[in-house]
Amino acid sequence: MVKKILIVFGTRPEAIKMAPLVKIMENRNDVNFRVCVTGQHRQMLDQILNIFDIKPDYDLNIMQENQDLYDITLKILCGMKNVLNDFKPNIVLVHGDTTTASVTALAAFYQKIKIAHVEAGLRTYNICNPWPEEANRQIIGVLANIHFTPTVKSAENLIKEGKNKEGIFITGNTVIDALFYMTEKIKNDKTFKIKVLSSIGNEYKINDNKKFILVTGHRRENFGEGFLQICEALKIIAINNPDIDIVYPVHLNPNVQKPVKMLLLNISNIYLINPLKYEEFIYLMSKSYFIITDSGGIQEEAPSLGKPILVMRETTERPEAVEAGVVKLVGACKQNIIRESQKLIDDQDEYEKMSKAYNPYGDGRACEKIINILIKGKNNESI
């Protein structure tokens, strides 16, 4: 019997990591699948759908101004009920730790539909950090039947929690599949590369003779005092290193925009630019000297590009990169951010040690493994 699989995502990071799965399924005749998007990140989500040429079968279009997690949860739960009743899938595929993923898993559970969780088993075991993501992924972990983990450590987390070993599969992370897809496209498609360079050039002129630090920040737990500390640190780094640029694509959330513009707007070597399209960000990341971020996905991507990463969080659910030496936790602490950034700028040995291009998150074949398991099951047996 041909499996009916519903793929659900709603944010830009989810879309990036699920897109390679969708593209592979499009070329297979042994699966009946549909794509549902919630629109949790409307504008940024649509950019990813366009670049990967994905046309959703269902769009809940939930995003409205000033809505909170209660609003998002209610809209997704009610919307998914209608989608599940219409398509009647055998398996619902969700990704990661978003509200879209956790509420979709709950909706599927209510209809006794099997749930497959991509990027399963990540844990900080601090329910409030990151918030609400840690709670989301633990909720999905309880509800899911099939767990696709990116690493051995994430699989071990699930086993320690008492999850059924027969439902746990180590596949690597699909974000590496997406990264390789996009870097190859930029490399081999000259027209596409010219378009990417032209678009970036409208925001920041890359100079191969000048180093730049790439910054991203958007985590809820850093709102308020955390972002003030981050911005103060960036300001001091910029002033102390006038020969190095800081490039910061600023998230659209007002909680990010306000402190960033208040503290960083008029510093000559800090470039506050608009959020970038995925392909533009990948290229900018590949050209950067190092990266300061609170993003989970960048912790997974940057090691493949040989970029040191300073993570502005107290904990990480991706300890493999820390253990590999390519990621260092600095928190939202001004002194830590300044100290570790200056070390990478001044100490070539430290930079070389962190920039070794070893990625513990996979070989770019995670999607292929996931689909084969979904279709055939373990040892070619149906799930």
Swiss-Prot record:
Belongs to the UDP-N-acetylglucosamine 2-epimerase family. Keywords: Capsule biogenesis/degradation, Isomerase. One of its GO terms (molecular function) is UDP-N-acetylglucosamine 2-epimerase activity. The gene is HS11.17. Its EC number is 5.1.3.14. InterPro entries: UDP_GlcNAc_Epimerase_2_dom (IPR003331), WecB-like (IPR029767). SUPFAM superfamilies: UDP-Glycosyltransferase/glycogen phosphorylase. It comes from the Bacteria. This is UDP-N-acetylglucosamine 2-epimerase. Non-hydrolyzing C2-epimerase involved in the biosynthesis of capsular polysaccharides. Catalyzes the C2 epimerization of UDP-N-acetylglucosamine (UDP-GlcNAc) to form UDP-N-acetylmannosamine (UDP-ManNAc). It is an enzyme of class 5 (isomerase). It comes from Campylobacter jejuni. It catalyses: UDP-N-acetyl-alpha-D-glucosamine = UDP-N-acetyl-alpha-D-mannosamine. Pathway: Capsule biogenesis; capsule polysaccharide biosynthesis.
